[in-house]
A protein has these predicted regions:
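Short, low-complexity N-terminal intrinsically disordered segments enriched in polar/charged residues
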Residues: 1-19, 23
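Hydrophobic pocket/interface hotspot
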Residues: 13, 24-26, 33, 50, ...
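A solvent-exposed, acidic/Ser-Thr-rich amphipathic alpha-helical stretch
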Residues: 22-74
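Short beta-strand segments enriched in hydrophobic/aromatic residues
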Residues: 29, 88-92, 123
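A short, glycine/Asx- and small/polar-enriched loop/turn
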Residues: 78-83
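Exposed beta-sheet edge and beta->alpha loop/turn motif
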Residues: 85-115
């Protein structure tokens, strides 16, 4: 296990996405971020560029709600690295009214300054919401 402050930072990052204001978590990211996303995209860019891209995705939704199932901070003792693992389900409502959900598992690395600098994302489609009768 590792210092829970990094897990708290990751929860704040997820919350800023839900709230539609990813820049609120800007100070939790390193100057350069690498990401391997669940759709196969690999990105390495500046913090501001990455956050602008994420904000553009978030802006395509009317709402986004993340339900966290588990989060834990761990330390890689052989590399002296700090990681946070998170599992959850994201339910997005498009501006058209369509609702979609995705099950997520993300592995985030935090540098020695407590800033996120790397994320691996794994995802699969969620079960469609039950239709009301």
């Amino acid at each position: 296990m590792d210092d829970p402050k990094n897990a708290e930072s990751l929860l704040a990052i997820w919350k800023s996405y839900d709230n539609g204001n990813v820049s609120a978590a800007k100070d939790l990211f390193a100057d350069t971020i690498s990401a391997e996303l669940g759709d196969g995209m690999i990105v390495r860019s500046s913090r501001d560029s990455m956050l602008a891209q994420v904000q553009a995705v978030r802006n395509s939704f009317k709402s986004a709600i993340d339900q966290v199932d588990a989060v834990m901070a761990v330390k890689s003792t052989d590399r002296n690295e700090h990681w946070v693992l998170i599992w959850g389900t994201e339910t997005d409502t498009y501006k058209s009214g369509k609702v979609d959900s995705t099950h997520l598992q993300e592995t985030w690395r935090f540098n020695k300054n407590g800033k996120a600098d790397l994320v691996f994302q794994y995802k699969r489609p969620g079960t469609p919401p039950m239709r009301s009768k």
